């Protein structure tokens, strides 16, 4: 390394240390300012948020992720008109957002290349590439808009800037032309020949044309760039020769890639990226090549530019787990069953425990009210009062975790082998030939062939007393080390030694060394802000001398696959073991139900194709519901109508409360959604939404996007063309009950379009208590049940006898209604349905206008 390179590295290291050390003084200043807040409730709430921010900063990936977790660093550059922010947003969330982010952003996502999981770091640069950016990236994506000449020329400029800082032959490059802004008003100006020439000028890089509006080639771009990085690393590794550890090349050891059904990863904005947090909508086009983990990736403190936008675009991928805004949670999740609050799952175990904060340099403990539910989620709140009020709560999804007790073998674990530890593998044996994991079923067997009937085995590993590290303290020897419990549910096969590739996740490698008394914190003033647990049971030399002294801690640790740890402590030995056993049972139950939970009611490929064709064959579905474009391939679920791709983009912008958009070709279609679409169709939908168009001209195929958007907003948002309500003395809610009882779909759709949430939830009467959802489920009508749920009916409502709609669905033996109700959080209570009188009318004539209220007979 030459002298200039050494100076550059030294300067970069000093700058990073200065940045890192500047965070805590600012946080401590906030703690001091909090003392001036007179309102105690507000003060505590702000303090909890600051603590959470501090925890997230301290537990960033550089301190928590195992060295065996490989990273791929992708930089994205382009000017404000290039469409790069929409490209990134579509890849992360599956949705389209037109707004461009001037400051760029930092995002994380898991991506799978050749069966190997990688942490993909995406850096959306807010300006031209600088030296720090150029030296950081493993690959670069240059983005321009096909309708903007300036963005096209900017790529040449940015490429020249990159070449000044780094040899571009060292890194893969990808060129992307975006089609998002192309319209009749903005025609395409960059033809294919010019784009191909640019790709040749950029050292013959791969060229893609993408459309973030409907996802064309978006996944393919990122998958391709990831594969190029991996291939480049392998080529470099071969040219260097066999090497166990290469700087900045963490792909030398594999990670246990658990093939679990899709779980959410948090793409967090590191350093003020524009995706600041995520709501609850599910992406419409999920990737089959990427797995998403249900974990929050902590942000770092770098800021791309000093100028921040006042309003950040919010992604549709995530929901905050803090529970600090119950109204938003209720609105966003529609009272799902596993939420915390009224109607949530009943805890199978609960009580007060001590929890250690996530700080690595001190042992600070606080009392938490902890609950464990049978849905595989452990929650903790600062107090019982907060739990009852559903505020300040945090969740731990136990699906990808393990639980361990320092110095004690978990009671459910069985010894399968006695591996020889190594400092590089944190106590895991390199000779694992006695362990076999079948390639398909996920079963784990030991040398003796012991195997659980469920296909999941618990295997413990004893580690030898070699030198190991924990919490930055070095220990040379110890009498016994703790055993890590491994719960294997991935499709991995190995009949030979697995070496470093054996599940090198923190759930295995995180062993616990003897307790040490930490050195005094350099920030002593912080102790007055947070309660610190007594460490009087430790010896002066920092080591607990006997097993009895270790046992007095009554501590257990939950470790996630990504390295997050949660330390809890009970008051007695029995209480701790009870918690550990209950948590292990829920981990096992979550793994066993993992496969079955994703196997919802799905049609086979052939029957699904026939079902989708039946949707296209509905009257009016050969043309777009709003502009008459032929052969529409996009659907609005709650409207029951088909539309063209341009109108679907406008419908997305209306919001899911008005239109739930889904692709016929790209998305999954459960049975209940197919039935909704097969029951309505464009002709029926327009008979409701366009009956009173009053001679206004409907947009045509050649109409501009602006004309189509004006029509669509007037039609669905302002409801200017909506058919009038039927003439009747009944209230809208009572009329909806009658239409549901009669299974009159058109009338029900019309009433739902006119009605409010309160009217949709109107009941048959004080002595009855049934809502329209009860009546729909009693009839086994999944179409009406699904529509009512989308329009805001309370799925947890009970009739006068305490029966939910689920009880009526079970009585009607309607599995489709049962599945829909459970999906939206209806309490799963198997009570015997108490008889409730039928809802009928005294006059069977549907056109009866006597206005008689539905009668209970």
Curated annotation (Swiss-Prot):
PH domain span: 346-588
Residue intervals of the GLD domain: 67-241
Chain positions with N-acetylmethionine modification: 1
Residues annotated as domain Arf-GAP: 609-729
UniProt-annotated stretches for the region Disordered: 267-343, 406-449, 496-547
Zinc finger (C4-type) residue numbers: 624-647
PANTHER family: ARF-GAP WITH GTPASE, ANK REPEAT AND PH DOMAIN-CONTAINING PROTEIN 1, CENTAURIN-GAMMA-1A
Protein name as it appears in the record: Arf-GAP with GTPase, ANK repeat and PH domain-containing protein 1
Source organism of this protein record: Homo sapiens (Human)
Underlying gene: AGAP1
